[in-house]
Amino acid sequence: MVENIALLPEFAAQYPFLWGSFLFLSGLAFGSFFNVVIHRLPLMMEQAEGINLCFPASFCPQCREPIAWRDNIPLLGFLFLKGRSRCCGQPISPRYPLMELATGALFVLAGYLMAPGVPLLGGLILLSLLLILAAIDAQTQLLPDGLTLPLMWAGLLFNLSATYVPLAEAVVGAMAGYLSLWSVYWVFRLLSGKEALGYGDFKLLAALGAWLGWQALPQTLLLASPAA
């Protein structure tokens, strides 16, 4: 198994089209699962009865009828159904194919920017969780602890061996990320009596600090500010 993984960089270099195709198809499959997380995790947070990430099987959000496996094929199912549910004829949200395409594109981009191995694995995890968090935030204005905290710990875990930054920088980055937004939150609240940020924002910046280190926090805040 380890020997096969060690051969991946050579395979990617010799067969870039096959490598890119593998990454794209993998991204489509993972993107399909990410849609499940985006739809169900907020329901689970509301303690909806009988719903978790695995049960029940995929169902129509409008009429809650089970979705046949052939209609659940990433991207193709949406195209075959022409964007409408087979069971009730209601429009299928374009978020589903867009999430699958976005995940596929990000997997390919990461695969060509990073050599196969631990850095690529970490990069895919980081990009995937950020994509899910962005979709949930846009839908519900929530950043669930069930995603932000594992993202932070994963960043520290990958940086135990300085995969992206030295561990000390990652730890300081996590602390600085949290405390910087926490300070802004309380200063703004004391001055205006209003809340401009949520605790999920603090934890997300802490997670990014754990992955990228404290030195990347100013650039991260600058890039994130237009979406705030």
Swiss-Prot record:
Main location as per UniProt: membrane
Pfam families: A24_N_bact (PF06750), Peptidase_A24 (PF01478)
Residues annotated as transmembrane: 18-38, 95-115, 116-136, 147-167, 168-188, 204-224
Keyword Methyltransferase: yes
Keywords from the UniProt entry: Cell inner membrane, Cell membrane, Hydrolase, Membrane, Methyltransferase, Multifunctional enzyme, Protease, S-adenosyl-L-methionine, Transferase, Transmembrane, Transmembrane helix
GO BP: methylation; signal peptide processing
Protein EC: 3.4.23.43, 2.1.1.-
Catalytic activity: Typically cleaves a -Gly-|-Phe- bond to release an N-terminal, basic peptide of 5-8 residues from type IV prepilin, and then N-methylates the new N-terminal amino group, the methyl donor being S-adenosyl-L-methionine
Subcellular location: Cell inner membrane
UniProt keyword tRNA-binding, yes or no: no
Superkingdom to which the source organism belongs: Bacteria
Lipid bilayer topology: Multi-pass membrane protein
Any Gene Ontology CC annotation: plasma membrane
InterPro entries given in the database record: Peptidase_A24A_bac (IPR014032), Prepilin_IV_endopep_pep (IPR000045), Prepilin_pept_A24_N (IPR010627), Prepilin_peptidase/N-MTase (IPR050882)
Gene Ontology molecular-function annotations: aspartic-type endopeptidase activity; methyltransferase activity
PANTHER family: PREPILIN LEADER PEPTIDASE_N-METHYLTRANSFERASE-RELATED (PTHR30487:SF0), TYPE 4 PREPILIN-LIKE PROTEINS LEADER PEPTIDE-PROCESSING ENZYME (PTHR30487)
Function: Plays an essential role in type IV pili and type II pseudopili formation by proteolytically removing the leader sequence from substrate proteins and subsequently monomethylating the alpha-amino group of the newly exposed N-terminal phenylalanine.
Similarity remark: Belongs to the peptidase A24 family.
Protein name in UniProt: Prepilin leader peptidase/N-methyltransferase
Organism: Klebsiella pneumoniae
Upper taxonomic lineage: Bacteria, Pseudomonadati, Pseudomonadota, Gammaproteobacteria, Enterobacterales
